[in-house]
C-alpha cells in the first residue's frame, strides 16, 4: 500500500513542481510569496497533495502511514516513535516552507505574470487527486488486492 500511495502522491507533487518551474523558472521557495490569491487552483491542488503526503486522514497517504506505523509499533517501538516524530517534523516543514513561503503573505510583483493551471494540467492531475481521495476514504479494493498477492507469496515461500 505504501509504495502505491507514495507513487500516486509523489507523481502529483513532482508534476506540481514542474508546473511552477515552467512558469517561474525557479524552485527557490523563498523567491515566492502570496501566490494563493494569484493561482488559487494550483494552491488548492498543492494543499490536497501535500496533505496526502503527510498522511492526513481521508487521503490515501493516511492508510499507508497508519499500517507502517502500526506494524512497526509492535515490532520495534523505538523506530515507531522515531517515525512518529518524522511525521510531525515533515508536517511542520511542509506547512512552514511551502505554505508560508510560497502561498501566504503579500504577492510579489515579480510573479504578477504567473497564471493558474491550464485545463490540460488539471486533467492530468485530477486522476491522481481522485485516487488519493477514493483510497483515502475507501481503501478496501487496493488492500484486498495486496492481501491476496501477499497470501499467495507467503504460501509459496512456506512450502
Q: Positions of the model-derived regions?
A:
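Cytoplasmic/organellar membrane-interface segments at the starts of transmembrane helices
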Residues: 39-41, 95-159
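Functional transmembrane alpha-helices
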Residues: 1-114, 135
Amino acid at each position: 500500500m505504501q509504495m502505491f500511495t507514495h507513487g500516486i502522491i509523489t507523481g502529483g507533487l513532482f508534476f506540481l513542481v514542474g508546473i511552477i518551474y515552467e512558469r517561474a523558472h525557479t524552485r527557490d521557495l523563498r523567491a515566492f510569496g502570496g501566490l494563493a490569491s494569484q493561482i488559487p487552483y494550483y494552491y488548492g491542488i498543492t494543499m490536497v497533495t501535500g496533505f496526502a503526503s503527510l498522511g492526513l486522514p481521508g487521503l490515501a497517504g493516511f492508510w499507508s502511514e497508519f499500517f507502517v506505523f502500526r506494524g512497526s509499533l509492535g515490532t520495534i517501538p523505538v523506530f515507531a516513535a522515531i517515525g512518529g516524530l518524522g511525521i510531525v517534523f515533515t508536517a511542520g516543514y511542509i506547512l512552514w516552507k511551502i505554505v508560508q513561503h510560497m502561498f501566504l503573505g503579500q504577492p510579489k510583483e515579480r510573479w504578477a505574470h504567473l497564471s493558474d493551471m491550464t485545463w490540460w494540467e488539471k486533467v492530468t492531475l485530477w486522476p491522481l487527486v481522485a485516487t488519493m481521495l477514493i483510497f483515502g476514504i475507501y481503501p478496501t479494493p487496493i488492500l484486498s488486492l495486496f492481501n491476496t498477492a501477499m497470501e499467495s507469496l507467503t504460501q509459496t515461500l512456506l512450502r
